[in-house]
């Protein structure tokens, strides 16, 4: 998998993802998209040249991000997950979903979001430590809890996005 860029973010990123999707033969290019049709459409348009490609869609799930960044409730976020993963699935069978700011997300809500994303067709679930909040032992515990509390987790690959902001 080549995480090639965020196509909607700029013309340069769109062009770079398109160029990569046109040139790769044995790798799978991936584009990043917020949980909106416009972002997912841009991903598809930039990736459609590849034999196989992945769309990686995400939405914030932590209380602080949902309140101050998205101005959305839990129910609205769940609706956006359902809509975006289902929409991305129309373009490719390879859909990755991320719970942005996952390490600051309420665990019970995280389990619901992951279960829903998989139910809607996500084949990879990414757990990001968006703000570098978690130490390795805590992050490992979170992954174990996800494995033990998300009933359909066996239908997806677990992926991680970590930072070393603490210099550990």
Language model: regions and residue ranges:
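Divalent metal-dependent hydrolysis catalytic cores, especially in the metallo-beta-lactamase
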Residues: 2-7, 30
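Beta-alpha junction/loop-to-helix N-cap segments that form part of ligand/metal-binding clefts
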Residues: 32-36
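Alpha/beta enzyme core
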Residues: 1, 11-24, 37-158
């Amino acid at each position: 998998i080549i995480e090639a860029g965020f196509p909607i973010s700029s013309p340069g990123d769109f062009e770079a993802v398109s160029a990569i999707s046109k040139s790769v033969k044995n790798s799978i290019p991936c584009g990043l998209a917020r949980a909106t049709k416009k972002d997912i459409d841009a991903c598809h348009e930039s990736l459609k040249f590849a034999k196989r490609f992945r769309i990686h869609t995400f939405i914030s799930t932590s209380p602080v991000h949902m309140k101050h960044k998205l101005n959305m409730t839990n129910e609205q976020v769940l609706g956006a997950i359902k809509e975006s993963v289902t929409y991305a699935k129309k373009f490719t069978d390879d859909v990755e979903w991320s719970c942005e700011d996952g390490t600051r997300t309420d665990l019970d809500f995280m389990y619901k979001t992951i279960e829903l994303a998989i139910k809607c067709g996500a084949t990879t679930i990414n757990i990001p430590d968006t703000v570098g909040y978690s130490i390795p032992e805590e992050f490992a515990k979170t992954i174990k809890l996800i494995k033990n509390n998300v009933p359909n987790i066996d239908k997806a690959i677990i992926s991680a996005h970590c930072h070393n902001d603490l210099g550990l």
